[in-house]
A protein has these predicted regions:
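C-terminal regulatory/interaction module of P-loop NTP-utilizing enzymes
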Residues: 1-150
């Protein structure tokens, strides 16, 4: 999973290994069940070891919303969706956004980034070097976080 990337856009990526570790910790807190956790191959990996943003939302976030957190109230401890009222809001522009929210493949990019940003130890990375991935240790991302390139 260390060499699998969730493609946010052409320049930004999340590391799949970081993402599932953080999500699985939240699932464990919510359910106390290892059976509900997601594995490395929960989502089919595409070209260049990437998972599209659309697949992440339609498969992973939908699973969390529909199967893990369906009985949670948004005020419950451990609820990970914050102020998100309904799952469809991942596909809609912000109601209060006069400038127009960026939709990528029909996905509200800001809402997804805000959701993932609230998870522990998940970083946004700049474009990876796919040619070098075979030489990396299993637990190390192959490029720097976007915030470290300032």
């Amino acid at each position: 999973a260390a060499h699998i990337w969730v493609k946010v856009d052409n320049e930004e990526y999340y590391n799949w290994g970081e993402l599932i570790r953080s999500i699985n910790a939240k699932i464990n807190e919510a359910t106390s069940s290892a059976d509900k956790q997601i594995g490395n191959w929960f989502v089919r990996v595409g070209k260049e070891n990437t998972i599209s943003l659309k697949k992440l939302v339609n498969k992973v976030l939908f699973y969390l919303w529909n199967d893990i957190y369906k009985d949670f109230d948004k005020d419950d401890d451990g609820y990970i969706f914050g102020n998100i009222e309904n799952f469809e809001s991942f596909f809609e522009p912000e109601a209060s956004d006069d400038m127009g929210t960026e939709l990528v493949d029909g996905i509200n990019l800001k809402r997804v980034k805000d959701f993932i940003g609230a998870l522990n130890d998940v970083h946004l990375y700049s474009k990876p070097s796919f040619d070098s991935r075979a030489d990396l240790p299993e637990d190390k991302p192959e490029f720097e976080t976007a915030s470290s390139e300032e």
